[in-house]
């Protein structure tokens, strides 16, 4: 379930859809790090991902055509507890940056084609 804050036609009962984008990226990063670490023989004792997205609400609220409706940028840090060397972790990061599907979706243009269909009520 997602929601919007009070004042944005929401009840503040769940994360905003944009926060779910960050959660999807964080989850995909963690999973991809674990997969490629195992492939490279790197043992990960613990991993966590912290992300922040910067969004100017003027875009979302259609107050400025020059401001994007979504994130202007996403920054974050992946914290890894491991006996691996710094150079091995840097190589791991390069592989993850290349093969993380959600990161790939966010970094390159993706064709998205959405339609709307009217549902007819049974009483109509």
Please provide the spans of the model-predicted regions.
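Extended beta-strand/beta-hairpin segments
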Residues: 1-23, 35-124
């Amino acid at each position: 379930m997602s929601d919007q804050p009070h004042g944005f036609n929401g009840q503040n009962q769940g994360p905003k859809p944009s926060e779910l984008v960050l959660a999807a990226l964080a989850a995909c990063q963690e999973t991809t790090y674990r997969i490629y670490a195992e492939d490279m023989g790197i043992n990960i004792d613990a991993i966590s991902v912290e992300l922040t997205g910067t969004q100017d609400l003027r875009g979302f609220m259609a107050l400025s055509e020059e401001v994007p409706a979504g994130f202007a940028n996403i920054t974050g840090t992946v914290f890894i507890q491991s006996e691996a060397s710094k150079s091995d972790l840097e190589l791991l990061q390069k592989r993850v940056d290349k093969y993380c599907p959600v990161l790939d979706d966010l970094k390159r243009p993706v064709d998205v084609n959405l339609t709307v269909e009217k549902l007819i009520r049974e009483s109509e």
